[in-house]
Curated annotation (Swiss-Prot):
Name of the protein: Trigger factor
Comment, domains: Consists of 3 domains; the N-terminus binds the ribosome, the middle domain has PPIase activity, while the C-terminus has intrinsic chaperone activity on its own.
Example of a GO MF term: protein folding chaperone
GO biological process: one example: cell division
SUPFAM superfamilies: FKBP-like, Triger factor/SurA peptide-binding domain-like, Trigger factor ribosome-binding domain
Enzyme class at the top of the EC tree: isomerase
EC assignment: 5.2.1.8
Cross-referenced HAMAP family: Trigger_factor_Tig
């Protein structure tokens, strides 16, 4: 096998591979000899079928095996001898026409093909002491604990029917039937019977509860509302009416926050319940803080490290990103013009996102590898269990799918690897904690979550 480099440009490499006719004949004969010992053909004793006869019957299918074996061998040879790290699967192009393949099969001509691939970029990784990160943190205010306690107390609060003829007030619990319509026609999921609604809880569409206030048992009213723009795609932004019938109006009893309330929710004391609420809020703030500083860290890494990217990886990432854009548009029904842009401009913006994700993915993979970061199997297993739990009744199927598909399992491992890597970088960066309000922290976290993550482009 003769391998000659024909292109070395940036991250692109191309090679011409020639398999001499004699080599083809030898490989073909070797496989036919192996087949001879196994095949059973009427009229011939086991192991006595002439090789020439086998070649007439199976030669072309065996030739395909020979070619595949040669391709695999060439790929290994190219990567090992040139110490290359491929950025994806090599592309194989066969030279010549069908007649050339036939000549190779008859061992009267050499067999040639091309191998084209992109390699991973090489870049130097220094220390991270020059990276400065502002980390937002927030204290858990006692009023937030009390607010959540109040919500639990509301859930546990008793309601007593109001006197006959009494109108519903804010804070009352009403039992209603309703039929929702758009353009005068009922829509799927827009109707309900014997639905309990606490007026002022903001659990229904904005404007709905306010229009129920003042109604009495037995009264009907047509309520007009507009679905929020961020509602489900088929209903977002649409005007609707609801024909509402009030069946019961109940006034709230006294709200009690004591040990009995705590016991109703499985706690021994009110203080134990408060402590759990504080812990839950603290965990929520910590997760929000992490999202904020992680985004800031990735931004700094993206600015600090610039290197050539494999076009194939960028194209694949862009295709993934763009498919999501198209699906989002299908769900929302919005066009680029309605969003204040054009398809051309949107493509340019999302290509930058794809480039960022590939760059950060390659960078974090390299940093993690050099730092010796590994994700233990038990951590992957725990994450896989959590993923399976998201599909009740299909847990075993989900578990088996990931366990039998290493590429799919890497989708579970990659985010864990990324988190460990950014934690490692953070230990070396300059971090300044800044106390902010809950609202500011959650806003920053939401902005970070809405931005494009690196994790999908990361591989360990």
């Amino acid at each position: 096998m003769q391998v000659t480099e024909t292109l070395s440009q940036g991250l692109k490499r191309e090679y011409k591979v020639v398999l001499p006719a004699a080599d083809i004949a030898s490989r073909l004969d070797e496989q036919l000899q192996e087949m001879k010992a196994k095949v059973r053909i009427n009229g011939f004793r086991p192991g006595k079928v002439p090789v020439a006869h086998l070649k007439r019957l199976y030669g072309r299918s065996v030739m395909l095996d020979v070619v595949q074996e040669a391709v695999n061998e060439a790929n290994r040879k190219i990567l090992e001898e040139n110490n290359l790290r491929p950025a994806g699967e090599p592309r194989i192009d066969f030279d010549g026409e069908k007649e050339d393949m036939e000549k190779a099969f008859e061992s009267t001509a050499d067999f040639a093909f091309k191998v084209a691939l992109e390699i991973l970029p090489k870049f130097e990784i220094g220390g991270f002491e020059d990276i400065a990160i502002e980390r937002f943190v927030a204290d858990v205010p006692e009023e937030e604990v009390e607010r959540i306690l109040g919500r639990f107390a509301d859930q546990n609060r008793a309601y007593e029917p109001r006197a006959e003829g009494a109108a519903a007030e804010k804070g009352d619990k009403v039992t209603i039937d309703f039929v929702g319509k758009i353009d005068g026609e009922p829509f799927e999921g827009g109707s309900g019977e014997d639905i309990d609604l606490v007026l002022g809880s903001e659990s229904f569409i904005p404007g709905f509860e306010d229009q129920v206030i003042g109604l009495k048992v037995g009264e009907q009213r047509q309520i007009a509302v507009t679905f929020p723009e961020d509602y489900a795609a088929k209903l977002a932004g649409k005007a609707a009416t609801f024909d509402v019938t009030v069946k019961q109006v109940a006034a709230p009893g006294e709200q009690t926050i004591d040990d009995e309330l705590a016991k109703a929710f499985g706690y021994e004391t009110l203080e134990a319940m408060k402590e759990q609420i504080r812990t839950t809020i603290s965990d929520e703030y910590a997760a929000a803080s992490r999202a904020q500083w992680k985004r800031a860290l990735l931004d700094e890494l993206d600015k600090k490290y610039q290197f050539e990217l494999p076009e194939g990886l960028v194209e694949n990432e862009f295709a993934t990103v763009w498919r999501k854009v198209e699906l989002d548009q299908q769900r929302s029904g919005k066009t680029f013009e309605e969003e204040g842009t054009t398809e051309e401009a949107a493509r340019a913006d999302y290509r930058k996102i794809a480039e960022r994700r590939v760059r950060l993915g390659l960078l974090l993979a390299e940093i993690g590898e050099k730092a010796g970061i590994v994700v233990p199997d038990e951590e992957v297993g725990k994450a896989l269990v959590e993923r399976a739990r998201a599909f009740p009744g299909q847990e075993k199927m989900i578990w088996d799918f990931y366990r039998q598909n290493p590429k799919a399992l890497n989708e579970i491992r990659a985010p864990l690897f990324e988190d460990k890597t950014v934690d490692y970088i953070l230990t070396q960066a300059k971090v300044t904690d800044t106390k902010v309000s809950k609202d500011e922290l959650l806003k920053k976290a939401q902005e970070a979550e809405e931005s494009e993550p690196a994790e999908e482009a990361v591989s360990e």
